[in-house]
Every structure is written in structure tokens, then in C-alpha cells.
Amino acid sequence: MAYLRSSFVFFLLAFVTYTYAATFEVRNNCPYTVWAASTPIGGGRRLDRGQTWVINAPRGTKMARIWGRTNCNFDGDGRGSCQTGDCGGVLQCTGWGKPPNTLAEYALDQFSNLDFWDISLVDGFNIPMTFAPTNPSGGKCHAIHCTANINGECPGSLRVPGGCNNPCTTFGGQQYCCTQGPCGPTDLSRFFKQRCPDAYSYPQDDPTSTFTCPSGSTNYRVVFCPNGVTSPNFPLEMPSSDEEAK
């Protein structure tokens, strides 16, 4: 009987290890509430200052993203809206958020048994962010940051309430969105790259913006406002909300 119990425990631990390739710890250090979102797994969670949300991601998860929503109001059924990052007016996101929103993107257990991950500003910027492996292994497996005052310095043509749009979102077309083949940086995409060199500033900004870690042995942490401060042009106080059962 003891052998059976030991075998069952071993099987259970092996199953959990096999099922989940990585854990993502999402923390809000902003001096305001952030409604974190995660797709295709996780959904959404209200995070007041100092709160953390843990997401377990299965092997093979790809085209995944984590972002923060701001200035949200949800009712008891989880329906409402957000000023930035809104995902169809629901607390539990199943689709991508509406720009502008700073993105932590990842794909697990891909080529050569590597996780691929990045911070992207292709959908614009709303909240400062750090994205980091909790156990960095050197090379391209290290913390990356986008903590500049982008909202405060945003060009007038890209400025919107609560954030700063990417030129692809604002203007569209080949020049900014690379819709019909290769394209390069523009003056507007360089605005983002100069302030956040780790992050994607336009869709084909891969060489300096894609990071990798060994799959299955790396967990990650996403922190909103890692410095504990926010851009001057962003409101420090958000409207109260009655939504969400945590």
C-alpha cells in the first residue's frame, strides 16, 4: 500500500510538471488599481497595489499575452469597460485587448525546446512593465524593461486618454504595420525604441526584441510599474469598482 501511495504521488507530481511548462507571477506595483488580463489562459483579475496573480501555463502555449487594463468599471457579473486594454467589455478576457496596451508576449516550448518571450509596444503603451525570468540563465534569458515616461512624452499624433498609441494602430499601412512584406523603423517607432530598447517598437523589430529561456525549467514574473511610480500624465487615482470576485 505504501508503494502504491508513493507511486501515485510520483505520478501526480510528474503529471503536474508535464502539464504546466511555466508559472507567470503578475504583480501590480502601480499606485492605482490595474485589471490584469491574460489570454489564451487566465482571463482577468483585479490587482490593487501590491497584489499578485499566479498563472500556470501549459506546454506548447503560444500567441499568449499578458497586459494591464486601466480605469475600469465592472458590475457584479463582470461586465463593464476599461479606458485602456479593454477586451470586449468583460472582466474575464478571451480575446485581445484594445490598444493602447503594453504587452508581455510569450510562446512556450517552441523551437529547440525554448520559450520565446518579449515586451511589445506594437499595440502602444499604457503601463510601465518589467518581464523577467525568475531564474535567469544568461544569454537571452534575462530581465527586460519598459519603464520610460512614454505617456508623458507621447507625440501629439499618438496621444490618447490613458496611453500612447503605436503608429501602426493610428495610421495603419505598410510603412508602419509591415502588412505587405518587410519594413523598417520610422521616426515614430524610434520614439518607442529609444525609450524602451528591449521592446518591440514595430512588427518586424525581432533582432533586438525577442528573448529566449530553456523551456520547462523557467518561470516568469510580470510587474506593472516596477519602480512603483507612474507617468505624470496618467491619473494616480482610478474610479472605484464593485466588480469581480477575486
UniProtKB/Swiss-Prot annotation:
GO CC annotation: vacuole
Protein's recorded name: Osmotin-like protein TPM-1
One example GO MF annotation: beta-glucanase activity
Induction (free text): By viroid infection (tomato planta macho virus TPMV). Triggered by ethylene. Accumulates in response to jasmonic acid (JA) and acibenzolar-S-methyl (ASM) treatments.
InterPro entries in alphabetical order: Osmotin/thaumatin-like_sf, Thaumatin, Thaumatin_CS
Organism in which the protein naturally occurs: Solanum lycopersicum
Keywords: Antimicrobial, Disulfide bond, Fungicide, Glycosidase, Hydrolase, Pathogenesis-related protein, Plant defense, Signal, Vacuole
Function: Antifungal protein that inhibits the growth of several phytopathogenic fungi (e.g. Trichothecium roseum, Fusarium oxysporum, Phytophthora citrophthora and Colletotrichum coccodes). May bind to beta-glucans and have beta-1,3-D-glucanase activity.
